[in-house]
Amino acid sequence: MSEVDVPELLFERVWLQVDRDRDGFIYAKQMPSFITQCEQVIKDTVNTNKTDFHMTRFKNRLKLPLLPKLHMDLIDAFAKETPYYKIYKESFSDMLNKLTGNNFSTVINKIFEDCDGFPASFISALEVKADVKSSPRSKADSLGSPIKVDLLRNLKPQEEPETPRRINRKYKSLELQLESMKRELEDKEKTIMNNERNLTELRSTISKLKEKYDLLSEEYEQRHIHGGNNGTAIKHDVVIGELKSRLQEQNRLIRILQEQIQFDPQLKRETRVHDNKSKNNTFNGAIAYVIPFLLFIFVIRSLITKEDIGDATMALPWWERNNLASRLAWYFRDVFSNDSAKFLESDAYDKVFGIH
């Protein structure tokens, strides 16, 4: 490449076009235009001599545009957010480096990296135009006609910082936006709280269902392990123990009554002679105690065990498979049946209950 600093020549030329009043700085909103004008100057320069073979080959090897779309979007966003930020001539390259990761010289040199040097006509075009632009006499020419210069100067006051009224209006607009965002935040917080509450309820329900499932699974395993269709093998040991103790108590009372009848033959004969009222008075206490107990057994039994449907018609009732319960059931069935008087007179009745 040539020893001439092409990026510097290009920068000086475009800076004179953008900094029309020679303030030594440009605003951030002018930065996108600066990049665009740099690209346009390069295109115009290479097209000055279309018959030059070296210039044509140089043009075909250029890598335009200067910046990719992503970097231009970053510069546009910076210009819109801080339109009146002052970028001084000495700090322009650093600002470009902060936004795109490359300074001005690097950006310009990248588009020429495939070229075998700069054609002499290209360098001379940049130098001549730069000299013309730098002369005070040609300031109006660089901007176009004097009318254009006057129009741009007349528009200059509109580019000054915003008035207090506009600032106040923007402040109120920002306040409204802030209130709207606060309301949205509150709504989202309420939604989150409702979701958390629903989640807690669902977790509680799932926990209860899991406990029930575990209990049923364990009971099912116990039933199959300890007896198949025999419903006595159930987890509820406390209930079963209570039933056993009550059955033992009832068995004891029955033995006491049998001993009293066997001990006093006269009582046995009087029992046969007297009417049913005398017999009922003898066993009234036992009957009043046993009947609620039997009802309690049937209710508990129906709650804690159920027979399989398929075996219901083939298996005997549970109370018939238990000797003590079977004897009690048949005894009270005989006592309260219509033919109870006949059973009282029969020898079979005496034989069953051990009365001789």
UniProtKB/Swiss-Prot annotation:
<dbReference type="GO" id="GO:0030474">
    <property type="term" value="P:spindle pole body duplication"/>
</dbReference>
<keyword id="KW-0175">Coiled coil</keyword>
<dbReference type="GO" id="GO:0031965">
    <property type="term" value="C:nuclear membrane"/>
</dbReference>
<keyword id="KW-0206">Cytoskeleton</keyword>
<protein>
    <recommendedName>
        <fullName>Monopolar spindle protein 2</fullName>
    </recommendedName>
</protein>
<keyword id="KW-0472">Membrane</keyword>
<dbReference type="Pfam" id="PF17060">
    <property type="entry name" value="MPS2"/>
</dbReference>
<dbReference type="InterPro" id="IPR031433">
    <property type="entry name" value="Mps2"/>
</dbReference>
<comment type="similarity">
    <text>Belongs to the MPS2 family.</text>
</comment>
<feature type="transmembrane region" description="Helical">
    <location>
        <begin position="285"/>
        <end position="305"/>
    </location>
</feature>
<keyword id="KW-0812">Transmembrane</keyword>
<dbReference type="GO" id="GO:0071988">
    <property type="term" value="P:protein localization to spindle pole body"/>
</dbReference>
<dbReference type="GO" id="GO:0005737">
    <property type="term" value="C:cytoplasm"/>
</dbReference>
<keyword id="KW-0539">Nucleus</keyword>
<keyword id="KW-0963">Cytoplasm</keyword>
<keyword id="KW-1133">Transmembrane helix</keyword>
<comment type="function">
    <text>Component of the spindle pole body (SPB) required for insertion of the nascent SPB into the nuclear envelope and for the proper execution of spindle pole body (SPB) duplication.</text>
</comment>
<dbReference type="GO" id="GO:0005816">
    <property type="term" value="C:spindle pole body"/>
</dbReference>
<feature type="coiled-coil region">
    <location>
        <begin position="165"/>
        <end position="264"/>
    </location>
</feature>
